[in-house]
Amino acid sequence: VVLIELGGTAGEYQNIVYYEAYRIMKQSLPDDVLLVHVTYFPTPQHINELKSKPTQLSVKNLHAMGIQPDFIVGRAESTIDDKRKEKVAYFCNMHKDDVISNPDAESIYQIPLTFLEQKFDERILEKLKLPKKSAKIQSWKNLVDKILAKKTRRVSVAIIAKYLSTGDYELKDSYTSLLESLEHAGWHSDTDLEIIFIKAESLEKKTKKALEDLHRADGIVVPIGWGSRGVEGKISAIKYARENKVPYLGLCYGMQLASVEFARHVVGLEKANTKEVDPDTKHPVIHDIPFDKKYQTIKGIGASMRLGGYDCILKPGTLAHKIYAKHNAFKDKKKNLITERHRHRYEFNNEYRKKLEDKGFVISGTSPDDFFVEMIELPQKDHPFFIATQAHPEYKSRPLKPHPIFAEYMKAVLKYDNEHDRGTTSKI
């Protein structure tokens, strides 16, 4: 079964060609295609009643395009009662059982169970004329129980962010994969997680709130990013994590900037930088990938990115190797080979490998041809958990199976919370 999501609202001119494509597919293959129409049932506060008119109008727009939805999934603050289901079904040419209630829930992971109670899965199989199957849902129920259960521990993780503000609002959507990956690890370690978003630019300005938030964090994450805005704030947070032995996880840009921070403050290359920020830097520790035929991954205009899944060889004895070995996550254990997803156009400059390694910098993962630096870390004798990767492990974490890096990062954060005396930490 292939799922295709068409965003926006019914009738938007940008989506007309897709609606027409669906209409033709449904006409040609009536038993192989179905449409689930997600609509909103508002509840005006002054009358406290679910209203179905917006849904009726939305379906009317679909009818005007020759489309009849097979299901309506109604988003609402509360459960859609039978009376309103019957009303919607009557005006939208549907069976009442094909109007599915999708009320607000404490956790989004409860929603599959809500659908199961309404036999949504059985109705889909029936309409697609597929064999009926019993849903193997127990592991999911156990997960939901873990999510909703009162946790025995609570920790704080700071994410040094730059994609938060939009007008008067602060949204976390840009970091959804990262947030979910941290939550996955928290659920499976019986830990309640407080996420502290710290704007990188606030760290550059050294605002009181930003510094206080950084100093109270049990772990620090520097995630994906582009461009120069907020870079020095991110680097200052990395320096703080390194010097104070706060568990650190760097993702993509977080690995590149960790390399820059080490080059500046440990190796002594004061002008070290990434060419993305300073094209004329004296010490380009991070530079753009030489996209010759060997490393060209995208054809055409803007062909400048290493995108998709790539293999990596881990160095035995390193933290990275121990993490993947512990979770049996090797693609090929004999070759110490793993695979992770990527999205970057800059990379570690191999001319600086020896200079950094001579000062204790550990390159724990490289591409099979030893060209790309994929993972870096600090020796565990110097720092309990400082690891960064050019890849995006957050894209492979799953609710029932947290990514190994996030699972072990959470353990390090818990250990720090239990052992660390915040009164002795230094300031950035």
Which residues does each predicted region cover?
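N-terminal beta1-alpha1 cap of cysteine-dependent amidohydrolase-like domains
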Residues: 1-382, 393-428
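Short FAD-binding loop at a beta-strand-to-alpha-helix junction that anchors the flavin cofactor
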Residues: 385-391
